[in-house]
Amino acid sequence: MSRVRDAGCVAAGIVIGAGAWYCVYKYTRGRDQTKKRMAKPKNRAVAGTGARARAGLRAGFTIDLGSGFSPPTPVRAEAEDRAQDEASALDTVGAEAVAPAASSAEAQSGAGSQAQEADGAGVGPKAESVVGAAMASAIAPPPGVTEALGAAEAPAMAGAPKVAEAPREAETSRAAVPPGTVVPTEAAAPTEVTEGPGVAAPTKVAEAPGVASPTEAAEAPVPATPTGAAAPTGAAESPGTSGSPRTAVVPGTSAAKKATPGAHTGAIPKATSATGAVPKGGGKGVTRSRNGGKGKGKKSKVEVDELGMGFRPGDGAAAAAAASANGGQAFLAEVPDSEEGESGWTDTESDSDSEPETQRRGRGRRPVAMQKRPFPYEIDEILGVRDLRKVLALLQKSDDPFIQQVALLTLSNNANYSCNQETIRKLGGLPIIANMINKTDPHIKEKALMAMNNLSENYENQGRLQVYMNKVMDDIMASNLNSAVQVVGLKFLTNMTITNDYQHLLVNSIANFFRLLSQGGGKIKVEILKILSNFAENPDMLKKLLSTQVPASFSSLYNSYVESEILINALTLFEIIYDNLRAEVFNYREFNKGSLFYLCTTSGVCVKKIRALANHHDLLVKVKVIKLVNKF
């Protein structure tokens, strides 16, 4: 029996010595390699488990002592069971299990051998985490090294943020522990380690072994050193965001420690926004962010007005024009309640002038607030009775210049149709539109005159609009020469003087017409000549027209260089007056020299200039001239 015992002791000594030598070799070789290159993470398929590593060591150093003897069975300590249970629990929580590094395998093999030695020396079952005296003296790294033996290496995932704190085994004291002493152990809650001031951030901290855990990780029982022995916890911090510098707390420095919530009770600490995001695929039960999305955090803000003008960039040109017209504020129409759920205020929104209902944000979709258009209709849109009523109500209630202009344009375009001319009158829209000419804004006045001009094509509407003729004439004379208000106002008066019913209202304005005729541009001349032609066809207005003193420049309308349109209307006026002079006998004594009567007689200046137009290049003018010359 003594020989058998001696052989067993020899075998155990050989195994222990070989394991210690192998650990020293790997440790020193690993330190040399860390200075040269970064360690690459190993996946689960490449890296072997602790049991496989121990099996490899046993297979390499087994001594055949005969058929009656078998290699000594390693003693598995209770702490090792707990550590493996926790490692398996972390594997089930994480989406990708962390592969133990080569150093983990070596540490576990060394721990297995230490367990055998502890069995013979009388060390307790929790002695696995404490390195023996011989190994501690042989393997004594400096206290500033952050590599902790027995911890797994965190997987390096490109672009994925890492958890800053992970429960792992704390480094035991580097002091030599006398053999045969039982080291008391106690479970300590993981602490949140913060960097102390002046601590350098090593670039090789990613190589420091550490188990990367999900946001909520279970506590790991950490063996503690006896009282009086310094046991710094080498906690490595992983960056919370990609591209951040990696920092580590070096043991031996004065680093401030904050107790994690629940540390005094042993509760599982929950990661907050300060600890960084969970690595992609870090847990089977995916941790959701605060705003409900998966993975990356999503913005919860609705897009704001980037330009400060009351609309977003995607609202279209109409909104931009609306805001610019009112000093940088967008106009939203106040719409009356529609009857019987009628659409027209929100359902006419085009895709080009509005934001889409939802926008793509990562993997989720969030609603985007819809913004109403400044005006509910297109200005060239043909509306029905109910929509016309809404536009009239909007025009009457709104004090916004932009809304008033767009509403007047919409009504003006709809008034081109005879059916809508009657509809607007029946809806009481004539006074609403006509009152807009009292506005001081020339743009609003112009749009109102355009609508009145189109509405005046209806004879019944003329009876309602004739009360505004003198007001329009006053605005024409007060406006700038050749302005849009003058042109549109003269067009309205042209329609109102087609019949003889309301011409007498402008009898006192004939002299003003001749003044504008001599000073105005081409459009002004054309409209005034049409009005004077209407007066000339009315016998009651003819005498007043002929007795009016006209400027000497009136005869210049019949020169050959005058525009064809002006020339044709001037020839038409002369033809109407000449025909009335031939049909009716007038007393020359009733008219003063310089009046229109003397210019239009056979011996007048106009007749001589008209004869000179017989060879005019314009065919219509030439035909008109030939017709008049035959009457002379």
Curated annotation (Swiss-Prot):
> Which stretches of this protein does UniProt put in the Cytoplasmic compartment?
26-632
Spans of the ARM repeats are 376-416, 418-457, 498-537
Q: Which SMART domains match?
A: ARM
Topology of the protein relative to the lipid bilayer: Single-pass membrane protein
InterPro entries attached to this UniProt entry: ARM-like, ARM-rpt_dom, ARM-type_fold, Armadillo, Armcx_regulator
Chain intervals with Acidic residues compositional bias: 336-356
| Domain of life where this protein originates | Eukaryota
- Gene Ontology CC: one annotated term: mitochondrial outer membrane
- Stated name of the protein: Armadillo repeat-containing X-linked protein 2
Which organism's genome codes for this protein? Answer: Homo sapiens
